[in-house]
Amino acid sequence: MALSFPNPSRSYDSRQRCVRFWAHDASMEIPFFVEADALCGIEPTATPDEPGLLKAFDLNRARICTAAGRIYARHRRGSYTLAAKDIV
């Protein structure tokens, strides 16, 4: 089954320096994490702090969700971390 992203929530994790968001596959919730470096790479004007990274995520949500779906289809795991190389 394909992933869906019905929950627009996202949050910044300062300990892991990433933005966290969730996808759904049927009744399963799958957590995803996008590294700060990846967000700064796809949004060059992003600042590497919480407001800047959340804004970069919001501006590139469709692109990030597409990458998440592509990675999920290849490998099924409990959670996923997206790096710069994953978001094309």
Predicted regions and their residues:
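A generic signature of intrinsically disordered, low-complexity regions enriched in glycine/proline
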Residues: 17, 29, 62-64
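Acidic, low-complexity intrinsically disordered segments
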Residues: 45-88
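Flexible, active-site-adjacent loop/turn segments at secondary-structure boundaries
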Residues: 3, 10, 30, 37-40, ...
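A short, structured beta-strand/loop element
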Residues: 19-45
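Short, charged/polar N-terminal "headpieces" of proteins
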Residues: 1-23
